[in-house]
Swiss-Prot record:
This is Tubulin beta-4 chain. GO terms for biological process: microtubule-based process. There are nine genes coding for beta-tubulin. SMART domains: Tubulin, Tubulin_C. Mg(2+) binds at residue 69. The lineage of its organism: Eukaryota, Viridiplantae, Streptophyta, Embryophyta, Tracheophyta. It comes from the Eukaryota. It is found in: Cytoplasm, Cytoskeleton.
Length: 444
């Protein structure tokens, strides 16, 4: 079967990951001891995508958990699903990365990376036909960003033909945890552009907004935010885990969403999002789902798709739906908002349908869009980066770990190139495209 190996790193990654496993276990009828207590044969049919079956019919997640300090892991172990993970798969250091990318990537992280790779190798050998990896991490801290990208590049070397998908939490514009976030994020993006296949871009501010506006929560906790993320993560992979009329997997997703290899940063959304009080008043229908799914307020990162154009998009519908109706609604969206789609990629919206809805819902949908407006995120981080780097602020923390200023300059220009590429394809029209391409080829 097409297994996916899940890796979570750093505090943020481990907290998102923990929530994700709660959702996945719930969908497959696995209780917190790893025993199957479900009621449908469909839950077990392809359970091996995310779980190993151990002795005594116990199901163990294919998850590798890493951190440079023991704190988050300890609280995860004592949490509701702490006992389900394989104890050998917890890999942690003691020193912490102190929000320093260089520590995660070059010094502390580099010491721990081999033991992480051993666990990854063991899990990969345990699988029958590994499809790829999914990594949960944040880009603002030290471990998730520095060590996370180090691990991604090592895995890339060892498994070059497997898909690499990341769920990356970007630093958000108004909610900042640390001063050096722009440095860490820029250095990470520099790595992700080269080594990852698909990046789902998330950020806390957009998630807070969804909690306030749509879910009407007065004071949302990180638990609430992570729940949103885990709903999306489960939606992206549901086609692999349950039978469906139109299936997709990580590779199909990539082929349909990535027109140019560097432009693989996606916005994600989930529908239906309703506040707990108002659920009973609305019946779900495909048009309503589609409407909410494409709504700019629903995107889980702080970029507004109305400021750019969609290169491609993909929608995963779950539940007992008619494929015909899904297709009609998707065509409808494209026809009504044709100016928001680039005209030089015809049929650029793909939909897939999975028969099993998430727990407690009749139908749901997950949205993944490759929009040029994501450049807003990179642009914002890049401006903050430049403001500090111009004054060489906080730089000694990085050079002290053996980094070179040159690396910062490279990362900065790579990020700016990425923004320029998005802008170029946003402005391109069907007619002039061929000539531009030719000119560029001669120049290089």
């Amino acid at each position: 079967m097409r297994e996916i190996l899940h890796i979570q790193g750093g505090q943020c990654g481990n907290q998102i990951g923990a929530k994700f496993w709660e959702v996945i276990c719930d969908e497959h009828g696995i209780d917190h001891t790893g025993q199957y207590v479900g009621d449908s044969p469909l839950q077990l049919e392809r359970i091996d995508v995310y779980f190993n079956e151990a002795s005594g019919g116990k199901y163990v997640p294919r998850a590798v958990l890493m951190d440079l300090e023991p704190g988050t892991m300890d609280s995860l172990r004592s949490g509701p699903f702490g006992q389900i993970f394989r104890p050998d798969n917890f890999v942690f250091g003691q020193s912490g990365a102190g929000n320093n990318w260089a520590k995660g990537h070059y010094t502390e992280g580099a010491e721990l990376i081999d033991s992480v790779l051993d666990v990854v190798r063991k899990e990969a050998e345990n699988s029958d036909c590994l499809q790829g990896f999914q990594v949960c991490h944040s880009l603002g801290g030290g471990t998730g960003s520095g060590m996370g990208t180090l691990l991604i590049s090592k895995i890339r070397e060892e498994y070059p033909d497997r898909m690499m998908m990341t769920f990356s939490v970007f630093p958000s514009p108004k909610v900042s945890d640390t001063v050096v976030e722009p440095y860490n994020a820029t250095l990470s993006v520099h790595q992700l552009v080269e080594n990852a296949d698909e990046c789902m871009v998330l950020d806390n501010e957009a998630l807070y907004d969804i909690c306030f506006r749509t879910l009407k929560l007065a004071n949302p906790t990180f638990g609430d935010l992570n729940h949103l993320i885990s709903a999306t993560m489960s939606g992206v992979t549901c086609c692999l885990r349950f039978p469906g009329q139109l299936n997709s997997d990580l590779r199909k997703l990539a082929v349909n969403l990535i027109p140019f290899p560097r432009l693989h940063f996606f916005m994600v959304g989930f529908a239906p999002l309703t506040s707990r009080g108002s659920q009973q008043y609305s019946a779900l229908s495909v048009p309503e789902l589609t409407q909410q799914m494409w709504d700019a307020k629903n995107m889980m990162c702080a970029a507004d798709p109305r400021h750019g154009r969609y290169l491609t998009a993909s929608a995963v519908f779950r539940g007992k739906l008619s494929t015909k109706e899904v297709d009609e609604q998707m065509m409808n969206i494209q026809n009504k908002n044709s100016s928001y789609f680039v005209e030089w990629i015809p049929n650029n919206v793909k939909s897939s349908v999975c028969d099993i809805a998430p727990k407690g819902l009749k139908m749901a949908s997950t949205f993944i869009g490759n929009s040029t407006s994501i450049q807003e995120m990179f642009r914002r981080v890049s401006e903050q980066f430049t403001a500090m780097f111009r004054r060489k602020a906080f730089l000694h923390w990085y050079t002290g770990e053996g980094m070179d200023e040159m690396e910062f300059t490279e990362a900065e220009s790579n990020m700016n190139d990425l923004v320029a590429e998005y802008q170029q394809y946003q402005d391109a029209t069907a007619g002039e495209e061929e000539y531009e391409e030719e000119e560029e080829e001669y120049e290089t």
